[in-house]
Every structure is written in C-alpha cells, then in structure tokens.
From Swiss-Prot:
Belongs to the putative dsDNA mimic protein family. It comes from the Bacteria. This is Putative double-stranded DNA mimic protein YE2228. Pfam families: DUF440 (PF04269). It comes from Yersinia enterocolitica serotype O:8 / biotype 1B (strain NCTC 13174 / 8081). May act as a double-stranded DNA (dsDNA) mimic. Probably regulates the activity of a dsDNA-binding protein. Gene3D superfamilies: dsDNA mimic, putative. InterPro entries: dsDNA_mimic_put (IPR007376), Put_dsDNA_mimic_sf (IPR036763).
Length: 107
C-alpha cells in the first residue's frame, strides 16, 4: 500500500459519512433513522479514530492504522461531547486505489 496515496482525514470522514447515508435506510431501524435525521444538526457527528482492536473479530485482514481508519457516526448528549449513541462504526481503507469498507450497524 502507498502511504502517499491516502485519503486525508477530511476525505475519510466525508467518504464514510456518504456511505453511511447511502446504506442507513437498509440497515437501521426506521425509528433510529428518524431520530438521527431530527437530531443530527444539534447533536450529531462523525469522529475519526485508529481502528479499534475488536475489528479483528469482524474482518479477516490486518487493520493497520496506516491504511485503515474507523469513523464513528452517531449522536452525543450535547454539542461538543463524545458520541455516545453510535449508529454505525465504519472501517474504511484510506488508500485511494482500494475501495474497501466494512460497517457495524446499531442493533
């Protein structure tokens, strides 16, 4: 993988959020979608992290943080606080030539 051909942090967040919006209707409960849409403006967010260790339980490849990022999408109790109502955790390959993503949805 090429370290010089990676998505920026902003591009990674934007791409993960776009994928979330595209697939949420098929993977989230309608009540959760309504809540997210009503509250996102005030309490919503997407946060970028190195991949959590538990991804190894869900995927069969190395989630090297040089090439993968985890984006947590959800709602916080108030603006500026940490997301505590997680709607999706998106594992995204940051290399531009490899379109790989895996999502753990709210149950």
């Amino acid at each position: 993988m090429d370290l010089n051909n990676r998505l920026t942090e902003d591009e990674t967040l934007e791409q993960a959020y776009d994928i979330f919006l595209e697939l949420a209707g098929d993977n989230l409960d309608p009540a959760d979608i309504l809540l997210f849409n009503l509250q996102f403006e005030e309490r919503g967010g997407a946060e970028l992290f190195d991949p959590a260790e538990d991804w190894q339980e869900h995927v069969d490849f190395d989630v090297n943080p040089d090439f993968f990022a985890e984006v947590v999408i959800g709602l916080a109790d108030s603006d500026g606080e940490e997301i505590n109502d997680v709607f999706a955790r998106v594992l995204l390959c940051r290399e531009k030539d490899h379109k790989l993503c895996h999502i753990l949805w709210k149950e």
